[in-house]
Amino acid sequence: TTLFRSLEQILITSTSETYGTAQYVPIDEKRPLVGQSPYSASKIAADQLAISYYKSFELPIKLVRPFNTYGPRQSARAIIPTIISQLLNGKTEIELGSLSPTRDLTFVNDTCIGLEDIYKSNSLFGQVTNIGMNSEISIGNLAQLIAKTMNIQLTIKSREERIRPENSEVERLLCDNLKLLKHTDWNPKYSLEQGITEVIEWMKKPENLNYFKSDRYNV
């Protein structure tokens, strides 16, 4: 208890996947939580435990829900490096899962600034705050945007083994970031096009591209 009371604050990083498929858009912090996958269910449990410590012991927590963050050094299983690595390895026909789900994508630098701004805020203790761009793009259109940025004519093959189970797939994510904008000075610097260009330039370096095995499905 003494240690807890000496802490200035704790930021708990959650995920937009705790909201499940959008019941309304944009998705605000009041949206009921839905565990559509073991990952999101585990994050919901962690979120609720953190809130319980705030309510029971006044632990100074702030709970942050970033929507999809991307950038250099991202896991090979994420959609943007999956697309870019296949294209950089000479493929013009790439393999993806479902093309219809939409995602709200924030460049990693902007997400980090959002975390810092939430930390600096004098409010938001014991509350949830979204971080996202309030903009969505489908997986299919994202792949085409990346190909256009790389000046590549692209064909997409949707492979069944890459498609998430129907009841697990989050079909639509679009962030309501009004709470973040109200309580902080957050001002994202990167458009989707700028962020994608940063990732492409980083992945072009052979020592970086070697981390990504485009010939296999990373799960």
Language-model regions, residue ranges each:
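N-terminal Rossmann-like NAD(P)+-binding domain of SDR-like oxidoreductases, especially those catalyzing
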Residues: 1-69, 190, 197-203, 208, ...
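Glycine/proline-rich active-site loop of Rossmann-fold NAD(P)-dependent oxidoreductases
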Residues: 44, 69-82, 90-92, 108-109, ...
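Conserved active-site helix of classical SDR/Rossmann-fold NAD(P)-dependent CH-OH oxidoreductases
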Residues: 44-51, 55, 81-84, 113, ...
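A short C-terminal helix-loop "cap" of Rossmann-like NAD(P)-dependent dehydrogenase/epimerase domains
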Residues: 57-60, 84-95, 121, 149-161, ...
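Substrate-binding strand-loop-helix patch
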Residues: 72-77, 100-113, 128-148, 188-193, ...
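Hydrophobic "lid"/C-terminal helical patch
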Residues: 83, 87, 112-119, 143-146, ...
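C-terminal "lid/loop" region of Rossmann-like NAD(P)-dependent oxidoreductases
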Residues: 98, 127-129, 138-143, 151-172, ...
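Conserved C-terminal active-site "lid" loop/helix of NAD(P)H-dependent oxidoreductases
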Residues: 108, 163-187, 194, 198
